[in-house]
Swiss-Prot record:
TM region positions: none
Lineage: Bacteria, Bacillati, Bacillota, Clostridia, Peptostreptococcales
GO MF annotations in UniProt: rRNA binding; structural constituent of ribosome
Protein task: One of the primary rRNA binding proteins, it binds directly near the 3'-end of the 23S rRNA, where it nucleates assembly of the 50S subunit.
Protein name in the entry: Large ribosomal subunit protein uL3
GO biological process, one term: translation
Species, as recorded: Alkaliphilus oremlandii (strain OhILAs)
Claim: rRNA-binding is one of the keywords in the record: yes
Record flagged with keyword Ribonucleoprotein: yes
Entry similarity comment: Belongs to the universal ribosomal protein uL3 family.
Classification via PANTHER family: 50S RIBOSOMAL PROTEIN L3, LARGE RIBOSOMAL SUBUNIT PROTEIN UL3C
GO CC, any one term: cytosolic large ribosomal subunit
Length: 210
C-alpha cells in the first residue's frame, strides 16, 4: 500500500502498443514530503503523513511550524495520511516522487467533484420529466410528496432538489499508463474527479485484480 498527493492538470489521449487511442488524465506530483511516520507501538497503527504544496511561513501557525521543523521540511499547504502495512523504508523529511508508482499499477484516485450549485431532481437524481405538452400540468417537478392524511409528511431520504457536486469522490482501479519522472507527471487511464488544478489523493488500489 502506498500513496501520493497530486494536482490534476487535465485530460488528453495516447496510443497504446496496439494503436488504440485511450483517454488519459495527467496528474502533476510535486515532491511529497514525509512529515510524520506513525507506528503501531506509538500511535496504534502504521501510517505516513505527507505534506504537499508550498505555503508562506507567515501563514503557518506556531504548532504547525513546529511540526514541520521537527520533520525537517518547509511548511506545506496540505497534509494527507496514508495507512500502510509497514512503515519500513520511510523516514520523516523523506521526499516521495512520481516514481513511487510504475506503469501498469492499479490505483484509486480521490478528489472533490466539480460543484454544480442548486439543481433540480432531473439533473441531480436523473429522474424522468413529465410530458412537456400544453395539456400537462407536470413537467420537471420532484413528483409525489407527502400524500394526504396518511402519511401527511415527506419521508426522510426523499430525492429532492438541492446542492449538487462538490463532494468527495473516489474512482477505483485506474491504470497507470506512464510515469514521467523528469517532469513529475503521473498519467492514468480514464477520468478523475474534480476541476483542473484540483488536489487528488492517489492510493494503491484496494481491489487489485478483482
Amino acid at each position: 500500500m502506498k500513496g501520493l498527493v497530486g494536482r490534476k492538470i487535465g485530460m488528453t489521449q495516447m496510443f497504446d502498443e496496439t494503436g488504440l487511442v485511450i483517454p488519459v488524465t495527467v496528474i502533476e506530483v510535486e515532491a511529497n514530503a514525509v512529515t510524520q511516520v506513525k507506528t503501531i507501538e506509538k500511535d496504534g497503527y502504521n501510517a505516513i503523513q505527507v505534506g504537499y504544496g508550498q505555503i508562506n511561513e507567515r501563514n503557518v501557525n506556531k504548532p504547525s511550524k513546529g511540526h514541520f521543523d521537527k520533520a525537517g521540511v518547509t511548511p506545506k499547504r496540505s497534509l494527507q495520511e496514508f495507512r500502510l502495512e509497514s512503515t519500513e523504508g520511510f523516514t520523516a523529511g523523506q521526499e516521495l516522487k512520481a516514481d513511487l508508482f510504475k506503469a501498469g499499477d492499479k490505483v484509486d484516485i480521490s478528489g472533490v467533484s466539480k460543484g454544480k450549485g442548486f439543481q433540480g431532481v432531473i439533473k441531480r437524481h436523473n429522474q424522468s420529466r413529465g410530458p412537456m405538452a400544453h395539456g400537462s400540468r407536470y413537467h420537471r417537478g420532484p413528483g409525489s410528496m407527502g400524500a394526504a392524511s396518511y402519511p401527511s409528511r415527506v419521508f426522510k431520504g426523499k430525492k429532492l432538489a438541492g446542492h449538487m457536486g462538490h463532494e468527495n469522490v473516489t474512482i477505483q482501479n485506474l491504470e497507470v499508463v506512464k510515469v514521467d519522472v523528469e517532469r513529475n507527471l503521473l498519467i492514468v487511464k480514464g477520468a478523475v474527479p474534480g476541476p483542473k488544478k484540483g488536489l487528488l489523493t492517489i492510493n494503491t488500489s484496494i481491489k487489485q485484480g478483482k
